[in-house]
Amino acid sequence: MPVLFRVKVIPLVLLLAMIFAFLLNWPILLHFYEILSHLEHVKIGFVISITFVLVAALNVVFMPFSVRFLLKPFFALLFITGSLVSYSTLKYKVMFDQTMIQNIIETNPQEAHSYLNGSIIIWFVFTGILPAILLFSIKIQYPEKWYKGIAYRLLSVLASLSLIAGVAALYYQDYASVGRNNSTLNKEIIPANYAYSTFQYVKDTYFTTKVPFQTLGNDAKRVVAHEKPTLMFLVIGETARSQNFSMNGYSRDTNAFTSKSGGVISFKNMHSCGTATAISVPCMFSNMNRTEYDSKKASNSENFLDIVQKTGVSLLWKENDGGCKGVCSRIPTVEIKPSDNPKLCDGKTCHDEVMLENLDDEIAKMPGDKLVAFHIIGSHGPTYYLRYPAEHRHFMPECARSDIENCTQEQLVNTYDNTLRYTDYVLAEMIEKLKNYSDQYNTVLLYVSDHGESLGESGLYLHGTPYKLAPDQQTHIPMQVWMSPGFIAGKHINMSCLENNAAKKSYSHDNLFSSILGLWDVSTSVYNPDRDLFRECRG
């Protein structure tokens, strides 16, 4: 590659620190000055010092990587990865903690493709690709003597530390006050945020002691006292938030179909275990509650599906959302392939109606009592407009693009509400199918979303915000239950009691494990009656 110019290594590292500070860390600078704009008394010297401290800190962090043969590939990689992180932070206010790194690593190609748009490509080219290419086009001059190289680097680091110390002496109270009231700021510095989170994820995933696989409910027994077998549909939703459910008080009729099904109960105060699928799905199926949840333990442990299966129930998992996060690994699974159904699929993803295809044949092949779990794509963003067919474009105008921050709020909400309305249509179709089976089975449907979604409130989009910082839109989720008269009678359920509890009491994914076991009348030591949200209403 031709050499464009020559530069000494120490000034180059300082220049790189400045580029990262002013370009890729533009989101945190904006956040910092947004915070300061709401304070009554701000010292001008403190404001000016922020960028100097950021440059100095990055210079200290970067200096150890300024050695020959490492500098260019290392910083080229930082430019490329930092560019994507910077864009996501700037546009969606995404926070790159360990959970977000897990989400990225577990993302499938179809999901990753949905985030591509003109804006991110332009940003990536100018802040990631071009700087990386330019870096390889310069001639770096290193000190001839190794000890001079060490001495110059130490002097540069000491100068940066001295500047930081000087600023701290003058404005420590100001930094402490802002930091104390805005605890996420230190997690927004690029590349330290995602580099540290990636290190933690790799360490915890690949370099910690392997957790022995734990079986659950080996003592499980089920009392079968009904003439008819049971058929349960368990529907795991994607990215639906309670706030936009008309059954929960939303002004728009997003539950236009299930509201006409008759007997559908909506749980108005349901909360998720996490703010991302990678956490919420394994957590809701596990016997751990949210505060004690451990991903490693969950991935090396059985869940309530395994326990129900041990009691003789036939299980089937139908997957339309890119993967079950390990919860279906020990039960029969049907993976929906877009290539198999061009009518309901676009080659990459499928509309959730596809879950009803071949369902009757699949049920017929399952002996005895049956549980069919559906993992739907639901309201998966940012390409909300691809989640429903043309005939379900009810709320208009829609946001037919993936860079949703460039749509109007009306367009964005319209499109998201269309996804909920379409999911509601699919659920109503499932309920109708269960009604048709009610002569052969006692039937029941339970629908619950994995997490919610932000639609631009407070500048936040999508989901994945750390739970303790997440807004209600990302954690307050819908759950619906429908039961056939035969199921209600067989389980001795007081529906008035259940409706009252669903309207007034608060529940969460923590309740799902024991509630499902309870509905199946499973007796086991891991069943917790206090977490069974149906128990209080059973005679």
Predicted regions, residues:
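Flexible glycine/proline-enriched surface loops and loop-helix/loop-strand junctions
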Residues: M288-R290, Q411-L412, N494-N500
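Histidine-centered active-site microenvironments of extracellular/periplasmic hydrolases
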Residues: G249-D253, D439-N442, L446-H492, Y527-P529
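A long, amphipathic alpha-helix that forms part
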Residues: I189, E357-D361, C399-T443, V481, ...
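Conserved beta-strand->loop/alpha-helix structural units within folded catalytic cores of enzymes
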Residues: G237-T239, T311, T423-V426, M430-K433, ...
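Short, P/G- and charge-enriched loop/turn segments at secondary-structure junctions
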Residues: A220-R222, L462-A470, E499-N501
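Active-site-proximal alpha/beta segments of enzymes that process anionic O-linked groups
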Residues: A168-L234, T239-A400, H476, K504, ...
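Short beta-strand segments
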Residues: H271, W317-E319, L371-G378, D417-T423, ...
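Transmembrane and membrane-interface helices of multi-pass
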Residues: M1-K187
